[in-house]
Structure formats: structure tokens, C-alpha cells
Design a protein with these regions (language model features):
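Tandem CBS (Bateman) regulatory domains
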Residues: 10, 29, 34-77, 91-121
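Short, small/polar residue-rich loop motifs at catalytic or cofactor-binding pockets
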Residues: 15-18, 77-80
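A short beta-loop-alpha structural element at the N-terminal edge
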Residues: 1-4, 63-64
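N-terminal non-globular leader segments, chiefly Sec-dependent signal peptides
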Residues: 8, 12-15
Length: 121
């Protein structure tokens, strides 16, 4: 919600174990606020700012049916930390670079049967 404050955003992130939250106004996605955005707001003494005030860029939005490879490539090329995922025009979730890394690790393990060692790069 665009009217939520920094404290509410922190609580939501902690409750759900996430580092990005969508900022919406009704059914419209205004953007994404990250943990880093909240740290910056607090460091600047802007604890009273609402989430709508923290959103500064147009979100990277993809449809549910988009290819993960295409989305991940676009995120990497554009240096974007998250993508807002819509399903039939409605917010379905957020895909983060962390999500992509976890999936990549699973695929690599499945296909290459990587030994589980501490010697990893």
C-alpha cells in the first residue's frame, strides 16, 4: 500500500522473510521498495515517509507467462534487482535476483550433480 509507513514495511518484510515489497495504489503497481530503500530512508531521518514517497522508478513488470530465461536475462542486463510479476493484469508476486540464483543452483545440481562441498567458488 502506497500509504504504509517505513515501520509497517519493515514488519511486513520480517513477517514474510522478504527483502522487496510491491507498492500499490488500488490495483495499480507503483513500484517496489527494497530493504535497502528502507535503510536509506532511516539513515536520512525519513522514518515518517510513506511507501509511495520511496518509489522512485518505474517498476520492471513482466507477465506470469514470460520465460524465466528472458526475465532473468533482462534483469541482469539492466541491473534490476526485482521484477513485478502480473497474472491477468493483477499482482502475482515479485521475482528477485535471489530467487533466480536459488533456481539456477537447483538446475545446476540436477543436471551436473554437483558435490556438496565447502570448496565452491
Amino acid at each position: 500500500d502506497a500509504n504504509a509507513d517505513v515501520t509497517t514495511a519493515w514488519a511486513m518484510m520480517e513477517e514474510h522473510g522478504i527483502r522487496h515489497i510491491p507498492v500499490t495504489q488500488g490495483d495499480i503497481v507503483l513500484g517496489v521498495v527494497s530493504e535497502r530503500d528502507l535503510w536509506r530512508a532511516q539513515a536520512e531521518g525519513r522514518d515518517d515517509i510513506d511507501m509511495g514517497g520511496l518509489v522512485s522508478t518505474i517498476p520492471f513488470i513482466v507477465e506470469w507467462s514470460a520465460s524465466l530465461a528472458d526475465v532473468a536475462r533482462a534483469m541482469g542486463t539492466r541491473k534490476i534487482g526485482s521484477a513485478v510479476v502480473l497474472r491477468d493484469g493483477k499482482l502475482a508476486g515479485i521475482l528477485t535476483t535471489t530467487d533466480v540464483c536459488v533456481y539456477l543452483a537447483e538446475v545446476l545440481e540436477e543436471h551436473y550433480h554437483s558435490p556438496n562441498t565447502d570448496d565452491a567458488a
